[in-house]
């Protein structure tokens, strides 16, 4: 039909209970409190989890003791044009950013298991990015989990971790990935989607 734009929504969120768990973090658990099958009026479930399980957003407080919590994140950073690029190396360093990411990109999602080095994070900040996302459960390289986190969070860059980008091609999309409103917490699960027009 003329005048109606085609729009496809791509879910890039990992299922909470089956997703990889970062070493040392608790696994999420669901507890059925009430059940219709046991003559209750409804089904009711409580969930116990780490706020960094599955697909989630890091707040500055995660690595900065005086940083703000996830409820204070600027939501405008979590919605808008985003570039998906693939990295076949182990790390996302400044060389990768300068060679693969055009100037002006504000939201960068990296496909693959790569994580950011400190200089890759610094180059992202220098370019004015407001959000970076990875498929790994941590944005930072394993041998130095603090540096990239601190560089990004001190500059109020939103960190989106645990994405599912295997079925997503490289290119530009509209990203929508909002944290839950939980006061002063260091992170939050989120439902992340890409909109392809």
Predicted regions mapped to residue ranges:
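Active-/binding-site microenvironments in catalytic and ligand-binding cores
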Residues: 2-197
